[in-house]
């Protein structure tokens, strides 16, 4: 069995990172898990916060230390290419990629297209295998988009009209993947529709999915 603990993430972006690392380190000590075989920290980031929040660098700096290291963390960056109202990389950071900050600890980064579901799974599996083999941090940069605004009052179409014109015309990742499976004759179109209906029904009835 796998025990999963989700840390409470406040509105202060990325501040939960050292909390997760400290919790995992404590669990490793309690279990006598010196090599990180049984405890795995996973951090989910946004692209703008990952590059912009100082606590990210502070946490990375402790990654390989004897007193605070957790034998490698898997970082998942949800790169929706927009930080509030700034979408031009020339205005958001001084590096090409939002993940360039991990060069400070020489962690590998897998950049993957969020529209390719199987590629995302493969990259994540590869990242986990790297962590288990080398016991170092690793990053999966999922390049995708945000359909709606940052919150109920945010309308990105006002500040990013060109970007959101393209997003509005995008069918969605699920539809793209379903169409691909139908084209490959893996499933029928009716199967895809039934899966969506079944999932929504299960969620509305508070039943376990999968």
Language model features by range: what are they?
Residues 87-91, 102, 107-205:
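Phosphate/diphosphate-binding loops
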Residues 206-210:
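Conserved small/polar residues in nucleotide/adenosyl-binding loops
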């Amino acid at each position: 069995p796998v025990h999963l603990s989700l840390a409470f993430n406040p509105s202060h972006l990325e501040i939960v990172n050292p909390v997760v690392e400290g919790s995992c380190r404590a669990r490793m000590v309690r279990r006598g898990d010196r090599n990180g075989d049984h405890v795995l920290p996973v951090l989910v980031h946004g692209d703008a916060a990952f590059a912009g929040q100082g606590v990210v660098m502070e946490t990375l700096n402790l990654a390989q230390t004897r007193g605070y290291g957790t034998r490698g963390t898997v970082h998942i960056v949800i790169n929706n290419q927009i930080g509030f109202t700034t979408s031009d990389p020339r205005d958001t950071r001084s590096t090409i990629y939002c993940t360039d900050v991990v060069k400070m600890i020489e962690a590998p980064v897998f950049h993957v297209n969020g529209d390719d579901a199987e590629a995302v799974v493969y990259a994540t599996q590869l990242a986990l295998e790297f962590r288990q083999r080398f016991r170092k941090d690793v990053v999966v940069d999922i390049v995708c988009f945000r359909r709606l605004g940052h919150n109920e009052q945010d309308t990105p179409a006002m500040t990013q009209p060109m970007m959101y014109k393209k997003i509005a015309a995008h069918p969605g990742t699920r539809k793209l993947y379903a169409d691909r499976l139908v084209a490959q004759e893996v499933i029928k179109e009716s199967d895809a529709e039934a899966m969506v209906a079944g999932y929504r029904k299960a969620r509305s009835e508070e039943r376990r999915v999968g």
